[in-house]
Amino acid sequence: MNDKDTFRMHTKVIQIGDRKIGGGNPIAIQSMTNTKTEDVKATVEQILRLERAGCEIIRCTVPTLEAAAAIREIKKQIHIPLVADIHFDYRMALAAIENGADKIRINPGNIGNPERVKAVVDAAKERNIPIRVGVNSGSLEKPLVEKYGGVTAEGIVESALDKVHMIEDLGYDNLVISIKSSDVLMCVKAHELLAGRTVYPLHVGITESGTVNSGNIKSAIGLSLILSQGIGDTIRVSLTGDPVEEIKSAKLILRTLGLRKGGIEVVSCPTCGRTQINLIDLATKVEKMVEDYPLDIKVAVMGCVVNGPAEAKEADLGVAGGIGEGLLIKHGEIVKKLPEDQLLPALKEELDHWS
């Protein structure tokens, strides 16, 4: 599958800093810092690491006026749009906007009375920065829980649209919507319902998905079910761990679905009793080695000479192990036989001179 084959629902184009989302623009990968935003040095260092990994939009929490003030200095040192995450106190939103946030994320239902919501909307309107309207299943309003007999996809969607209409009634439509749940199937259903009822870009993610292991599985399932229907304009893989891992996972999900090109795909056999080299170690090292290559190719790491050579030939580049040695295979042809300890350097040399 390639980009031309991949169906995308049409949504409104929204500008976030220098990045456009919606309207068929590439799906943007987001993450969120886990530093104290007031700590400018630590926050900038983490954002720069995320940039190098492929993060395209970053969100920072703004719980204090000091955090809001830090946005101005942080933005001087980073290269991607910054979203201010606001909860409860509308003054944090006003301060974040004043200090140059490229977008703000709010739940209009938890930042106070209508006058406070209007103050935030007016400030965003003055600078023409988007507002992301965020609703999570865990904070669904009691009347909607009672109306639908519990927390449901229908309730989540109604809550989100109520908030959107609140802002539209104030004369502003520079909006992005996010609806999240840790329940994968509920989250999928909610996105299906919402996508048919709005033209605003959707930020997609499975919230509180868990650690790197469990969170990756839940996010891959949920995001794939949503994205494969053409729904979604930005994504985040929410993990309990280093945010850089979120970017790696998001890139792999998009590439697997044919929604993004670039980056080397590593395939390897699951090992069996025929494996004749230390394949687990080799495959792990290959996967780490290729992270920063922009090449759009497939590399195979196979463990034995029974099926290895034939399977490696389906890749652009590969190795197939023997007893303490292995074959280097390129474009389906065996290039050379090498000792096991030379396979990784040989792969790297081929990648460095790839054409």
Language-model segment annotations:
Residues 27-33, 58-60, 82-86, 104-106, ...:
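Hydrophobic faces of well-ordered beta-strands that scaffold small-molecule active sites
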Residues 24-42, 61, 80-88, 144-157, ...:
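Active-site mouth loops of central-metabolism enzymes
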Residues 78-80, 98-104, 125-128, 195-201, ...:
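Glycine-enriched alpha-helix->loop->beta-strand junction motifs that scaffold or abut catalytic
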Residues 34, 39-40, 51-74, 105-113, ...:
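Glycine-rich, proline-tolerant flexible connector loops at the mouths of alpha/beta enzymes
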Residues 1-32, 125, 288:
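N-terminal amphipathic alpha-helix/helix-capping segment at the start of soluble metabolic enzymes
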